[in-house]
Amino acid sequence: MKPDDKKTILSYGAFLQDKGINFKLFAPNALTVHLVIFDKPEAESGTEYAMMKFDAGDWSYKLKNAGIGTMYGYRLSGPLNDSNVIVADPYSKASITQNSWRHIAKSLVINDEFDWQGDTWLNIPKSDLIIYEAHV
């Protein structure tokens, strides 16, 4: 059995499709993976759905009747994973955390469509860039 998407890193994460969301994660050493859906940002647990394993360690699940604003995480079990911990999607485009010492990182499904109105990438040479990094 193979997933519908192309096998590229860009196909991992959460994608809106046909009145639902397709979730895809790469976890080759996991024995089981559960998608956890949260009702509220402060929730510590949620509804769990067993994901299907495909070739080469890809895990997938189609959540029907869900969309933008869905909060989720993953629970993995296996030799390298603690099944008591819910983890955020490493491929997510947005996340939610609580400002506390013990929070459960949650990923958030967002609308990432934007009309760039024909704008193009600047392609500035790396030698002309000035990049600052700050930790707060």
Identify the residue ranges that each predicted region occupies.
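Solvent-exposed serine/threonine-rich low-complexity stretches and specific carbohydrate-binding patches
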Residues: 45-54
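Short proline/glycine-enriched turn/loop motifs at strand-loop junctions of beta-rich domains
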Residues: 26-33, 67
